Amino acid sequence: MEVLREKVEEEEEAEREEAAERAERTEKLERVTKSAEVSREGTILSQDELRDLEGKLMAIEIPTQADHSVISQAPVDVTKLPPSYTTNSLKEEHLLLVADNFSRQYSHLCPDRVPLFLHPLNECNVPKFVSTTLRPTLMPYPELYNWDSCAQFVSDFLTMVPLVDPLKPPTHLYSSTTVLKCQKGNCFDFSTLLCSMLIGSGYDAYCVNGYGSLDLCLMDLTREVCPLTVKAKEIVKKKEKTVPKKYSIKPPRDLTSKFEQEQEEKRIQEIKDLEQRRLKEEEDRILEAEKAKPDPLHGLRVHSWVLVLAGKREVPESFFIDPLTARSYSTKDEHFLGIESLWNHKNYWINMQDCWNCCKDLIFDLGDPVRWEYMLLGTDKPHLSLTEEDEEGLDDDDDDVEDLGKEEEDKSFDMPSSWVSQIEITPEEFETRCPSGKKVIQYKKAQLEKWSPYLNNNGLVCRLTTYEDQQCTKVLEIKEWYQNREDMLELKHINKTTGLHVDYFKPGHPQALCVHSYKSMLPEMDRVMEFYKKIRVDGLVKREETPMTMTEYYEGRSDFLAYRHVNFGPRVKKLSQSSVESNPRPMVKITERFSRNPEKPADEDVAERLFLIVEERIQLRYHCRDDYITASKREFLRRMEVDSKGNKIIMTPEMCISYEVEPMEHTKKLLYQYETMNQLKNEEKLSRHQAWESELEVLEILKLREEEEEAHTLTISIYDTKRNEKSKEYREAMERVLHEEHLRQVEAQLDYLAPFLAQLPPGEKLTRWQAVRLKDECLSDFKQRLIDKANLIQARFEKETQELQKKQQWYQENQVTLTPEDENLYLSYCSQAMFRIRILEQRLNRHKELAPLKYLALEEKLYKDPRLIDFVKVFV
């Protein structure tokens, strides 16, 4: 009874609450009705006000929800598309039914999950399964054989269009051919094209439908460091510990105070700690300022990317590729917040794992049906093996297993072939890449600009501008990449802070220039030139120049010269204006160093040679012997050949100061010193001349570089028929000559009067008598040729008839002795002979019928010939 009483009380209370709600709704309705009546009474508009309001309303444009922005801006002619775009085959219709059934089961089992992205509409508004939209294609360009180059091409070639609804996948998914034609698309279009190219190149690639961060979905790289600015880590070589020799000299005892050293080290460490703390605070402040604002849709933004699994193409580890930016990420990267499903050209998988920790804990074993639910049977991914207990349980009922196997075989369904046409990229499209030939990407404190080749007159294809601040207002440095330059310029690096310019060249420059570093193109300024040593005859590798010095480095010379350093003095001022070439800088000192010549003893092999030109001295230092500490040295006092009175100066021992490592082995006589002195004088002249030639070469290179920068001529391959003007003009001229020759041949073939006109003298005008004679000769000649042709056919006919009669007579005479093989040969011959006779008879009869008609037709043409019409019209 108590339970019944409680139920009655509950029902009464529910009825009271319902009545109260009904009364409240009635009051609200009355209140709204009264306010509407009041507002209606107070807002009566005049005719002018109504017209103004109508005009304002007509001016308002309401944006329509259409996520197929590619088609809306670049309409596609549906009539020119293949039938596979506009209709579905029976197999595709069956696949759509299977997909719908799969989606219903998934929604029933997982009601909290979003609907599956299975069969969006294509550009013809026909539903197509996502796996059939993939068209594996191997491009004919070797550059597109690797994943990084494929991703970079897709990122450069297409323009990103954001999803209309960032929380839902698009309702349309276009074919890659349409996307390539329009050169724009959303992230799903990007990933579909990239996945098709990667699968065609042999990668185990999949399109992913998931969730990404705000920067990833909007292709925002302003918080990412540009890959071109990341410097390669220098490998620090570890110094090998030298084992001290047993009898080596011990270092002197260190008498400094260890306490003072420790105090100094503590002080230095405190300064370092303060500096590190200050830098850490500055970095934290910058990171806090650059930190992105919290995204209210974090974890809900839909994004599509490409998954590449390890295994194929020697991929060691699975990774993600963002097709919008062509950057690769680890599968544990924080930019990727979750995965709903993924697919390739063979199957479709649903992620059954929890993504509470983004994608960090996901296991990409597509053969595990617990983690990845597949849609179609017969996938190429291996399934998990059964345990022994499961196998024993299955062995108990063999019939059920067989029936189950039959059912599975019946339920298996192969993926239909792709409905997309063959993906083709023309050489022009592959070369142009970027839409309209240009693309700009904004990175963190950097801006990257790309151009297609030959778009800029100077060959510029890429420019990277690095800035000091986050707002990109103060330029730090500029890097410019060039292609197809005649001067082989490849890269320009400009440092705006120091004003240093560095030009990099490919092999092939007229002066074998490799790197040119300078601050000014004026001569006798700070600059460094590096050369390709294998191209230079003199083995010059590097040349450093300052206003007062010039240093050259050599390799591989026959005289073993490795280094030359020239010191210049102040230039002597001349009254007349003179150029740098006519008034060179005076040389004060020349230092030359040589590599070891193994064919000479160390005491005779010069290691360093100094020409002190102003002091008139020459210093020599020889190579050091093995296991020796010091080396032999000599110094020559270079004097004039004659003194002030004109007397010849004789070589004296005081003019050569020498230090011998082993003076007892051999002593150099005065004659040897005199000959060495004369040889060094000649070598000094040669060194000064070579240094002067180096100065002239620098001036020549600077002049050449100025001309090259002003002209910036581009090279064009002989195989580029569109841009190569010389080749194009030559080809057009040849085609024109061939066409004219063909016309002449045709005219000669059709000119029936040509053989008769050739008999007349050249340039002579026709008379009436000659015209009539030409006409009669042409007709008589044609009549004779018709008669000759009839006689030829008649002669062949009579010959074939006589041979057949002879063969028949031979057969009648030898009929008794013939074998069956001979009879077969005879019958075959008779059949062929009768066929030839019949054909000749038909040709002869036809010729007799057509000969008069041909004669009359030629006669009519001659009467109408412009060369004879004025003379023979009287006789018509």
UniProtKB/Swiss-Prot annotation:
Disruption phenotype: Male mice were infertile due to their short immotile spermatozoa. Axoneme formation and manchette removal are impaired in spermatids. No morphological abnormalities seen in multicilia of ependymal and tracheal epithelia and cilia motility is not impaired in ependymal cilia.
Biased composition (Acidic residues): 387-407
Oligomer status and interactors: Component of the nexin-dynein regulatory complex (N-DRC). Interacts with TCTE1/DRC5. Interacts with DRC3 and GAS8/DRC4.
Location in or out of the cell: Cell projection, Cilium, Flagellum; Cytoplasm, Cytoskeleton, Cilium axoneme; Cytoplasm, Cytoskeleton, Flagellum axoneme
Protein name: Dynein regulatory complex subunit 7
One BP term from GO: sperm axoneme assembly
Tissue specificity: Abundantly expressed in the testis and is weakly expressed in the brain, thymus, lung and ovary. Expressed in ciliated cells.
Keywords: Cell projection, Cilium, Coiled coil, Cytoplasm, Cytoskeleton, Differentiation, Flagellum, Spermatogenesis
Gene from which this protein is expressed: Drc7
Region (Disordered): 1-40, 385-412
Keyword hit for Zinc: no
Top-level taxonomic group: Eukaryota
Pfam families per record: CEPT76_peptidase, DRC7_C, MORN_DRC7
Cleaved signal peptide residues: none
Positions with biased composition (Basic and acidic residues): 17-40
Homology family: Belongs to the DRC7 family.
Biological function: Component of the nexin-dynein regulatory complex (N-DRC) a key regulator of ciliary/flagellar motility which maintains the alignment and integrity of the distal axoneme and regulates microtubule sliding in motile axonemes. Essential for male fertility, sperm head morphogenesis and sperm flagellum formation. Not required for ciliogenesis in the brain and trachea.
Coiled coil: 1-33, 258-295, 679-710, 784-809
UniProt keyword Coiled coil present: yes
Example of a GO cellular component annotation carried by this entry: cytoplasm
Chief location: other
Organism this protein belongs to: Mus musculus
InterPro entries on file: CEPT76/DRC7_peptidase-like_dom, DRC7/lobo, DRC7_C, MORN_DRC7, Papain-like_cys_pep_sf
